[in-house]
Regions:
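Conserved catalytic segment of histidine kinase HATPase_c domains, centered on the N-box/ATP-lid region
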Residues: 66-70
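Long amphipathic alpha-helical segments
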Residues: 57, 92-97
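Long, amphipathic alpha-helical coiled-coil segments characteristic
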Residues: 1-40, 71-94
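Short, well-ordered alpha-helical segments
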Residues: 18, 30-37, 45-65
Length: 97
């Protein structure tokens, strides 16, 4: 039963808009949007125990805290990499009955 609950919440993460909002905010150089999205992503990852993505999103949140996007590229790439790894693993989990 606990496994089913964990799986349910993990799969719901796939529909969370935070990563896309972060991507859009950075592309538009919208520091406020990027910060809010990074902060939300960080919190969701902390709550769900997604440690690797939490760590890099927390670092990115701090870089964006001043609402400036300059200097965020390298950390964003790390967030993107961890997000891809995590979402692929969740998709595999979701495919299992």
């Amino acid at each position: 039963m606990l496994q089913a609950l964990v799986k349910r919440f993990a799969v719901k993460f796939l529909n969370d808009p935070s990563f896309q909002d972060l991507t859009d905010g950075l592309a538009a150089k919208d520091g406020e949007k990027a910060f809010r999205a990074a902060h939300t992503l960080k919190g969701v990852c902390l709550n769900l125990g997604f440690t690797s993505l939490y760590k890099v999103s927390a670092e990115l949140t701090e870089v964006l805290r001043g609402r400036e996007t300059e200097g965020s590229d390298e950390l964003y790439e790390q967030v993107k990499e961890q997000y891809t790894i995590l979402t692929e693993a969740i998709q595999e989990l979701a495919a299992q009955s």
